[in-house]
From Swiss-Prot:
This is Cytochrome b. The cytochrome bc1 complex contains 11 subunits: 3 respiratory subunits (MT-CYB, CYC1 and UQCRFS1), 2 core proteins (UQCRC1 and UQCRC2) and 6 low-molecular weight proteins (UQCRH/QCR6, UQCRB/QCR7, UQCRQ/QCR8, UQCR10/QCR9, UQCR11/QCR10 and a cleavage product of UQCRFS1). This cytochrome bc1 complex then forms a dimer. The chain crosses the membrane at residues 33-53, 77-98, 113-133, 178-198, 226-246, 288-308, 320-340, 347-367. Heme b b562 binds at H83, H182. Heme 1 (or BL or b562) is low-potential and absorbs at about 562 nm, and heme 2 (or BH or b566) is high-potential and absorbs at about 566 nm. Keywords: Electron transport, Heme, Iron, Membrane, Metal-binding, Mitochondrion, Mitochondrion inner membrane, Respiratory chain, Transmembrane, Transmembrane helix, Transport, Ubiquinone. Binds 2 heme b groups non-covalently. Disulfide bonds: none annotated. Heme b b566 binds at H97, H196. Component of the ubiquinol-cytochrome c reductase complex (complex III or cytochrome b-c1 complex) that is part of the mitochondrial respiratory chain. The b-c1 complex mediates electron transfer from ubiquinol to cytochrome c. Contributes to the generation of a proton gradient across the mitochondrial membrane that is then used for ATP synthesis. GO terms for cellular component: mitochondrial inner membrane; respiratory chain complex III. It is found in: Mitochondrion inner membrane.
């Protein structure tokens, strides 16, 4: 008799995705972040669901309802801080996951990569709308500044912004719709994750060497299930340390002041995970140019398969490309730092140089150095 997990229509899907899935024998801990992202999404949906039971999406009571969750709801404080810091963990895992894809050439799986970019945009949109919900000063002004960027679109810009706001400024209608979308999007993300995995399982996983490993595969369970559990425990340790010891470390103190349309905070800035894109936006003195650069800073990832000029897939055996990759990482950290600084000398020029370097590395220098490496190897 066939094992039920291999014959039952429902169990068969789970079996083929998580148990009997053939996986390369050489994948390192950099391949852990996919499962960690799944765990992050689960944590966010669960904590978000319980927070939504106590939250009110009304400008008069939103801030108060978050205070009520922290003070009066049983374990409300831990739900709120798990959700807020869970978003930070989500983005740390996302950036490492994308970085892994860039380093090891995973972007040659075109469908998986493109769905991944869609997921990145969806998660960023969800996080932005979630930041607006507590209705603190930074929530209100962040929403005002970022939605206002759409007014740079020719002809339809102003109408589009007013349509998103549901009025002539960020107000009650805006908060209500942001809550609705913030609740809905994670489920769309979960569906996109299924599509992401569907495309991945069509090709099988990449590995650090970038060489096809079809002749050397091992079952996902128990080898990689136990490895994923270890990764999950490490992430849980970091997340719980953040939540229990310094829950406000990554937040902005301005968000503990209720939203006031009549008083602008001295420095309007988004959460830390958007600072690199915010720095690129601010580095261009033109509004439309800034918006385009902001979108392209993420969308440029879609060009990676076209910009791959090397004869090798992975950077594992390409030291020159490795140098440029780590320069790109350092550049992104510089942009993140600049995004949190005021717009004054010397931060303006540093931001502009870092933005130029970011696009130059991806669009020009990395493809060129790959061609040089091909010649050095006489390929």
């Amino acid at each position: 008799m066939t094992n039920i997990r291999k014959s039952h229509p429902l169990f068969k899907i789970i079996n083929d995705s998580l148990i009997d899935l053939p996986a390369p024998s050489s994948i390192s801990s950099w391949w852990n972040f996919g499962s960690l992202l799944g765990i992050c999404l689960g944590i966010q949906i669960l904590t978000g669901l319980f927070l939504a039971m106590h939250y009110t999406s009304d400008t008069a009571t939103a801030f108060q309802s978050v205070t009520h969750i922290c003070r009066d709801v049983n374990y409300g404080w831990i739900l709120r801080y798990l959700h807020a810091n869970g978003a930070s963990m989500f983005f740390i895992c996302l950036f490492l996951h994308v970085g892994r894809g860039l380093y090891y050439g995973s972007y040659t799986f075109m469908e998986t990569w493109n769905v991944g970019i869609l997921l990145l945009f969806a998660v960023m949109a969800t996080a932005f709308m979630g930041y607006v919900l507590p209705w603190g000063q930074m929530s209100f002004w962040g929403a005002t500044v970022i939605t206002n960027l759409l007014s740079a679109i020719p002809y339809i810009g102003t109408d589009l912004v007013e349509w998103i706001w549901g009025g002539f400024s960020v107000d009650k209608a805006t908060l209500t719709r942001f809550f609705a979308f913030h609740f809905l999007l994670p489920f769309i993300i979960a569906a996109l994750v299924m599509v992401h995995l569907l495309f991945l399982h069509e090709t099988g996983s990449n590995n650090p060497t970038g060489i096809p490993s079809n002749m050397d595969m091992i079952p996902f369970h128990p080898y990689y299930t136990i490895k994923d559990v270890l990764g999950a425990l490490a992430m849980a340790l970091v997340l719980l340390t953040l939540v229990l010891f310094s829950p406000d470390l990554l937040g902005d103190p301005d968000n503990y002041t209720p939203a006031n349309p009549l008083s602008t905070p001295p420095h309007i800035k988004p959460e830390w995970y958007f600072l690199f894109a915010y720095a690129i936006l601010r580095s261009i003195p033109n509004k439309l140019g800034g918006v385009l650069a902001l979108v392209l800073s993420i969308l440029v990832l879609a060009l990676m398969p076209l910009l791959h000029t090397s004869k090798q897939r992975s950077m594992m055996f390409r030291p020159l490309s490795q140098c440029l990759f780590w320069l790109l990482v350092a550049d992104l950290l510089t942009l993140t730092w600049i995004g949190g600084q005021p717009v004054e000398h010397p931060f303006i020029i540093i931001g502009q140089l870092a933005s130029i370097l970011y696009f130059s590395l991806i669009l020009v220098l990395m493809p060129l150095i790959s061609i040089v490496e091909n010649h050095l190897l006489k390929w």
